[in-house]
Amino acid sequence: MPTSFQPTAQTVHEFIERTLWFETEESRIELPQRDILKRTEPLVILGEAGMGKSHLLEWLATFPGYSRCTANQLIIRHDPKTLLGDAKILVIDALDEVSGRKEGDAVDEVLKKLGELGYPRFVLSCRVADWRSATGLEAIREQYSDEPLELHLTPFDDDDATAFLV
């Protein structure tokens, strides 16, 4: 049984369906949050502080096969299997809250723990200002055969913000 926080549909805040985006060489692609569940590559979700990354990850963790933890919990856990439990996909929040000595340390520490778990699928969140794209993506590429995908959380528009606050 995982010891990480496991919200249910009843404990997760009702929130507005979010949109994420990523760039290809040709264009910018928008992705509704439900489509995250269909993706199989390593996912890195980026957004500004307070944009709802943690709420989005809590929502993901309500689905069968997903288990949520923070990056710090994963790094300091002696036996990371207790965080994954029976899940197949680890949802890792708040990479930006891990203090590292140099660029890439936090990503390397997370990947080391994922290695102890046999490199399961994962979703990782980080503040965009703290994510070192080239360093982080290269480190993930070295351990995973699928190309990682950076997804940016789209900010609320005025109508969404009003609906969220009501």
Segments and roles (model prediction):
Residues M1-V166:
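P-loop NTPase signaling cores
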